[in-house]
Regions:
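Short, Lys/Arg-enriched N-terminal segments with co-localized hydrophobic residues
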Residues: 1-10
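Contiguous, well-ordered beta-strand patches that form the walls/edges
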Residues: 81-113, 208-249, 393-429, 514-558
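Short beta-strand segments that buttress and anchor functional surface loops
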Residues: 54-58, 75-78, 98-103, 181-185, ...
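Surface-exposed beta-loop interaction hotspot
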Residues: 127-185, 443-492
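Large eukaryotic, non-enzymatic subunits of multiprotein complexes that serve as scaffolds/tethers
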Residues: 12-38, 52-60, 79-81, 111-113, ...
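N-terminal glycine/threonine-rich, aromatic-flanked beta-hairpin/loop signature
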Residues: 56-89, 188-222, 368-405, 495-529
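Short, solvent-exposed coil/turn segments at beta-strand boundaries
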Residues: 46-52, 67-74, 92-96, 113-122, ...
């Protein structure tokens, strides 16, 4: 197995950009042959089930008759059918015995959690090459990749002669929602997990990946008792690999399994133990009588079951994102480039609770000089919504629409299109009228993946203006001060989302459902700039999603943001507005996991 290698090369391509192989059913059949022997494990397997037999009865699922020959071989009969011999592995965590096995010559297996104190059982059936159909947001359906591990969860019990079946079984839960954990497996793998939604979770691979980026995957949470829960995630739209474990919050320990194919198409099927630490808790905002005991799913219209077997809430945005070349986007921009025009499909729909515009720049002339050979721009502001600018060395002034906010005391935040730019570009400018510092976020259409995605970078400098005496060395700077924090942002009374600042280089957003339960998530790389104490710039492009950029200034003192959206596509290029009122929901203590470290990452 790969974790026994002395050193595994770290993945340095973001998972949402990596081109995973479209493994066929036949290829997967061959790769799964070793699973007939059961999983491997660094820790010693448990013999708690050796020599025993269990009849597991599930609600709305199979009846599983197990005979455990020893601690590595079992015999299974499903629903009274033919007995099958297979390898397995078992681990214990307090009173819970967890065992995992695949069924030879199939792409199917079971992962079973047995509570020896109550005889209650949770069963995860897993399979590959599902041919499963899922709806996507435009109303169409897609067939998921064969390599994506599917799961179906059944709740049940161990049948005991002379005892009545229990009325209450294990169940789904929102009790874990909002919790954050650090885990270190016996394999050496280190992971941060943020359980920010009842249907999804964020995870940061601290050892597998070269970059500290957060990702989102559909997840399930099952409550065994007040301190023991079961968690799973499937890396849908990425490798399709499946991670599952039982955890005890009293001792902050876990026992689990990992099944699937990594980015090198290598089989990973191993069990693990781990130790961890709770790193924080976010508030969850659904009604007090909502206990999260129902699965949140999106149902495919063609699936006859309700909900369909294996159905789950999966956000697959890139599946309906229309690819455009750089030149196609530019031709669309020549036909239509708009600034701050209200349309139903424009980012102004995200500005219902925006901050007011300011006229503090009207009548001012100034020069913004950026470091290290960066641009030098001269400005004349004669109106509240129109400005003139020219690049250093130009003789002709360009006139453009602009919008400006006073985001903090005498701190101006404004934006405009760069005239006739190719690719189309805009600038978002922080101008401090107290100390003379400025930061420019340069945004333009196009990445190396899509012409209709945006890209951006930050440049730092000073302002030359009457009454200002800017410093020579002090600048605004990139920061990690927001890392771990979560805010809800309400753009209109009908539109709210939670933003979680997962790492110094990434950010996720989670959609609130009707009763404020947190549901679907997506994530992307980003940058954070500190402008003042408590005031920050956040820039994110919704990569492998819709390609739109959000560039906002967050004032944590008033819990309000304001800013701009930049996007382009077949309808042209648009510079719009973003603004929301917020609530601080909590924070994870995770900053110390990031940055330059003396230790060498990897396993």
């Amino acid at each position: 197995l790969i974790f026994f290698k002395e050193r595994r090369k770290k993945m340095n391509i973001p998972m949402h950009r990596f081109k995973y192989t479209k493994l066929t059913k036949e290829q997967i059949d061959k790769k799964l042959i070793p699973t007939a022997a059961g999983p491997q494990c660094v820790s010693e397997f448990s013999g708690a089930l050796a020599g025993k037999s269990l009849k597991i009865v599930t609600r709305d699922g199979p009846t599983l008759n197990y005979t455990f020959k020893d601690k590595r071989r079992l015999v299974l009969s499903e629903n009274g059918g033919i007995a099958v011999d297979s390898g397995y592995g078992a681990l214990t965590l307090k009173q819970v015995v967890f065992f995992s096995h695949m069924i030879p010559k199939t792409q199917k297996g079971y992962n079973v959690f047995v509570d020896l104190d109550t005889n209650l059982v949770t069963v995860f059936e897993v399979w590959l090459s599902s041919g499963k159909k899922y709806p996507i947001l435009d109303g169409k359906e897609i067939i998921v990749d064969d390599r994506e591990v599917q799961r179906q969860i059944y709740f049940g019990y161990v049948e005991v002669s002379g005892q009545e079946p229990p009325q209450k079984l294990h169940h789904y839960t929102n009790r874990i929602e909002g919790k954050g954990m650090y885990w270190k497996q016996d394999t050496g793998i280190e992971t941060l997990e943020f359980y920010a939604s009842v249907a999804s979770s964020n995870f940061v691979e601290l050892t597998r990946h070269a970059d500290d980026l957060g990702y989102c995957s559909p997840s399930d949470y099952v409550l065994i008792n007040d301190n023991i829960f079961i968690y799973d995630r499937t890396e849908c739209e990425f490798s399709g690999i499946f991670t599952l474990f039982v955890a005890d919050l009293f001792t902050e320990t876990q026992a689990g399994v990992r099944l699937g194919f990594n980015e090198k198409d290598e089989l990973e099927y191993y069990m693990f133990r781990g130790t961890g630490k709770v790193v924080g808790q976010l508030a969850y905002l659904e009604p007090f009588d909502d206990h999260g005991d129902r699965l949140m799913v999106v149902q495919a219209e063609s699936d006859p079951q309700t909900p369909g077997k294996g159905q789950r809430l999966v956000y697959r945005p890139v599946r309906y994102f229309q690819y455009m070349t750089d030149e196609e986007v530019h031709q669309a921009a020549l036909k239509r480039t708009s600034s701050f025009v209200s349309r139903a499909d424009a980012p102004q729909t995200m500005a219902g609770f925006n901050m007011p515009f300011t006229d503090m720049l009207v009548g001012k002339e100034f020069t913004l000089r950026y470091d290290n050979g960066g641009p030098i721009r001269h400005y004349k502001i004669t109106e509240q919504f129109k400005l003139k600018y020219k690049e250093d060395g130009e003789t002709q002034w360009h006139e453009e629409e602009y919008r400006a906010y006073e985001a903090d005391e005498k701190l101006i935040w404004f934006s405009h299109i760069l005239t006739d730019s190719k690719p189309r570009a805009s600038v978002q400018v922080a101008l401090d009228l107290i100390n003379g510092l400025t930061t420019c976020i340069h945004s333009q259409m196009g990445t190396k993946y899509f012409g209709n995605e945006t890209s951006y970078y930050a440049i730092f400098g000073v302002a030359e203006m009457e009454g200002l005496n800017p410093p020579q060395y002090v600048r605004h700077e990139l920061t990690n001060e927001l890392v771990g924090h979560a805010f809800s942002w309400t753009y209109t009374d009908q539109m709210s989302s939670m933003h979680l600042y997962t790492t110094p280089h990434s950010h996720s957003w989670t959609i609130f459902t009707e009763n404020q339960t947190l549901g679907a998530q997506w994530c992307a790389p980003c940058i954070y700039v500190k402008v003042r104490d408590g005031v920050y710039i956040l820039v994110v492009n919704e990569e492998a999603c819709n390609g739109n950029e959000m560039c906002i200034m967050i004032n944590t003192k008033i819990v309000h943001d304001c800013g701009f959206g930049f996007s382009g596509g077949a309808g042209g290029v648009n510079l719009g507005l973003v603004g929301a009122i917020g609530r601080h929901i909590g924070c994870y203590d995770v900053k110390h996991f990031f940055g330059q470290k003396a230790k060498v990452k990897g396993v």
